[in-house]
Each structure stands twice: as structure tokens, then as C-alpha cells.
Amino acid sequence: MDEGKFIVLEGIDGAGTSTQGPLLVKYLFEKDKKNVVLLTREPTKLSPYGLELRRRLTGNLLPGEKIIDDPEYWSNLFISDRTWHVHNVVGPALRLGVQVVDDRYDLSTISYQSAQGREMDELIQKHLGLPVPDLTLLLDLPVEIAMQRAGKDSQRTKEYFDDHAFQEKVRTNYLVAAQKLNKSRNIVVIDSSRPIDEIAKEIQHEINKLYGYQ
């Protein structure tokens, strides 16, 4: 049995990863009805690390608990959750031939926690040994547009990293990290300031190249 492909969607908050993920899953199934596709995301809702991340990101602190602004604390939690995710969800699925679409992966931690002050190269090193995606789609757009979109999402909870200046740093770091890693990885930067259908078509073009679809 051939292994599935590992596809990752990345981008700052409001970039549209949660919109494009389901569209990509639908497209993969439409192109080949034999495709079994898993849409997953990080931080997870399954591991103790992911649950702790989600609690802290949304500011759901316990009485007397303080906000932690330590980039090492955050990066360790994210990487622990990612390692759990790979060992328990992503890896087993890929080995079964499932096509895995992951909303956020290593570029997220590399970009966010380097914006907090950790060395980017150190964060890259900490991810060595984890599966390398077959394709990473980095959805890039101006922070102003991303924040407008995020603000219109009534289902979205305001999070710890929701700050304009911080998101500007994260956006820059995403692009720097993509350039650093693209020598050894398949990373495509996509302009996600455009309408949803235009973004989806460009993603589909990259998927066609990856799978050899016509």
C-alpha cells in the first residue's frame, strides 16, 4: 500500500486556512473517489498539550493563574502537541494510505515563537525528525485584511496572539522561514488576499502538480 501524502496549510490568523481546508478535502475526493482524506489541525483537541494550549490561547485561566509570556514555554507545548499528533494521528493515517490535510504544522511554531523572541534556526532544529510535508501551502496576506476577516468570524474566540504588531512579525517570519526551508522542502506561497474561489483554484493547481492530476 502506498503511503498517503501530507499536505499542510499555513498562515497568520485570518489567512483562510480553516476555509480552504474543507475545500481542499472536497477537491481531493472529487479528483479520485478512492482517496480517503483526513482533515486535522493544530493545536489538537486530543492531546493534553493541545488542550492546555487551547485553554491558554483563549485566556481561560484558572483562579490565580497568570498569563505566561515565555516563548520557550509556548514552543515546548506546541512541539509536544505536534509530536503527539504525528505519532497518534498523522503518521498512522499516512501509513494506511490516507491523504492528510493539516491546518497548521511546524512553520506555525517557527514563525510565532520566533516572533516572541526565540531563535528561528533553533526552532527549525527542534522539528528535525518529524515528518516533512509533501506540500506546504502558505497563505499570505496583509495583516489588516487578515484581522478584518478574523473580526467578522462570529464563531472565533479572541486569542492570546491577536495583536496587530505581533501578527506583522509573524507574517514576516513565515515568509523568512519559507525561504529558508524551501531549499529542501516543497513550500508554495499563495496570495490569500483574493476571493476564496481564486485561492482555491491556485491550491488545486498545486495539488494537480503534486499528484499528477490533469
Question: Language-model segments: which ranges?
Answer:
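NTP-dependent small-molecule kinase module
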Residues: 25, 144-214
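Hydrophobic positions on the alpha1 helix immediately C-terminal to the Walker A/P-loop
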Residues: 20
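Conserved lysine of the Walker
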Residues: 17
